[in-house]
């Protein structure tokens, strides 16, 4: 039986055992509704995506089928199917079934399927354990308040993985900006994040759109991130 079928059987058994799941709709406050209507649909959808459910799994066994890799969390029996669309497709073409990976999952689409479908973001587990964080990187946020002035705030961004994907980095940085700097409360215009490495190389995330799918599986060395700069316009 394939891994996917085993996982679905486990999920079905769980539903039969626990019974139906019910949800209760919560009213939206007038102030929240006003905030949501102040931006375009595209910006609203960006905020919804970057504040949506995400899952950070460690040391899961992967099983490859074509350009997809399947993982099942042994505790919750949750099936995760990762679509390879970029450099990870070539990198993992000779992957051996049962290899251990860390997996960062963000559900894609609006399906209510019990399976978590995601794109990219498979990386090697850390080579050793760390008591605290692996690295604290300086995060500088410059926010434009008028045509000739801006506020600047500095803080730290925690790096916990030796090998980290652009998908995870982009998602967690945007979530921090939403929580602490009102990202997507207004239109992001040409706002961007720049991640600079020790050797001068850099990676840019444009905040007026999602990270491109072909970049989601790209991984970089988390130990060599020098600084992160954000421009909010």
Task: For every predicted segment, state its role.
Residues 1-30:
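Sec-dependent N-terminal signal peptides of Gram-positive bacterial secreted proteins and lipoproteins
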Residues 48, 59, 71-73, 83-86, ...:
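Surface-exposed beta-strand edges and flanking loops
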Residues 72-88, 132-198:
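Mature extracytoplasmic domains of secretory-pathway proteins
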Residues 100-147:
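Surface-exposed, polar helix/loop patches in the mature regions of secreted/periplasmic/lumenal proteins
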Residues 173-233:
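C-terminal, beta-strand-rich globular interaction domains
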């Amino acid at each position: 039986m394939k891994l996917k079928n085993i996982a679905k059987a486990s999920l079905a058994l769980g539903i039969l055992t626990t019974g139906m799941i019910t949800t209760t709709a919560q009213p939206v406050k007038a102030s929240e509704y006003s905030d949501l209507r102040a931006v375009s649909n595209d910006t609203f959808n960006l905020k919804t995506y970057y504040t949506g459910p995400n899952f950070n799994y460690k040391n899961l066994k992967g099983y490859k089928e074509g350009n997809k890799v399947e993982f099942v969390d042994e505790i919750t029996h949750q099936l995760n199917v990762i679509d390879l669309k970029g450099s990870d497709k070539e990198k993992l073409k000779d992957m051996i079934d049962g290899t251990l990976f860390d997996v960062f999952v963000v559900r894609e689409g609006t399906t209510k399927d019990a399976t978590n479908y995601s794109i990219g973001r498979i990386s090697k587990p850390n080579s050793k354990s760390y008591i605290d964080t692996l690295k604290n990187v300086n995060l500088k946020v410059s926010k434009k308040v008028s045509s000739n002035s801006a506020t600047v705030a500095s803080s730290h961004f925690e790096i916990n993985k030796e090998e980290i994907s652009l998908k995870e980095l982009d998602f967690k940085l945007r979530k921090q900006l939403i929580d602490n700097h009102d990202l997507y409360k207004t239109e992001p215009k040409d706002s961007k994040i720049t991640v600079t490495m020790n050797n001068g190389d850099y990676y840019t995330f444009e905040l007026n759109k999602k990270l491109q799918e072909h970049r989601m599986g790209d991984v970089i060395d988390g130990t060599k991130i020098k600084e992160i700069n954000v421009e909010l316009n």
